[in-house]
Each structure stands twice: as structure tokens, then as C-alpha cells.
Curated annotation (Swiss-Prot):
This is Co-chaperonin GroES. Its main location: cytoplasm. Together with the chaperonin GroEL, plays an essential role in assisting protein folding. The GroEL-GroES system forms a nano-cage that allows encapsulation of the non-native substrate proteins and provides a physical environment optimized to promote and accelerate protein folding. GroES binds to the apical surface of the GroEL ring, thereby capping the opening of the GroEL channel. It comes from Nocardia farcinica (strain IFM 10152). Keywords: Chaperone, Cytoplasm. Belongs to the GroES chaperonin family. HAMAP family: CH10 (MF_00580). PANTHER family: 10 KDA HEAT SHOCK PROTEIN (PTHR10772), CO-CHAPERONIN GROES (PTHR10772:SF58).
Amino acid sequence: MASVNIKPLEDKILVQANEAETTTASGLVIPDTAKEKPQEGTVVAVGPGRWDEDGEKRIPLDVQEGDTVIYSKYGGTEIKYQGEEYLILSARDVLAVVGK
């Protein structure tokens, strides 16, 4: 995972999606048009968190750089930066952290 010069704001998370499967268990090749959108990725950068209701301190996020996360199928904004594709997600779009 390369370092990226993108810093998410507030409770946003920058994720690089894991590649979708290209073949089935039996060896059939899945065409691009039939691939499901991936819902798992690696956290590349994390914002500082949102402010509490009083605006006095930040509420930290539950994920950190390097975590593998599962996120909502249609959540986030897809971006392309220096030839790589990323997803900017809100913290609420992250459903789970995959154990190591």
C-alpha cells in the first residue's frame, strides 16, 4: 500500500477497494460487466474525526490506516488519483473491520 497525498476531512476515510474476483471456484472467467462491486478494501488514510456537539473536541474514528474494512455497497465517492482508484467513505458507511 503506497502512501497517498490525500488527507480526508472530518469523519471521512480513504479506502482502496480490493480487487473483485476474476474467476469462479470452478475456473470460469467472470467478465467485467458481471463482476459485483467490491465491498471490501484497505484504509489508506483517515480524517481527524468530527467535532462533538459542543464543538470542543474531536470524536476519533474506529478505523486506522492499514485496516481492512467492509463497507456499504453503494456508499462513498469514487475518485482516481495518480492512476489509482480510491473511495472516500463517511465513517457511517463502514460496516465492519476485518480481523487480522
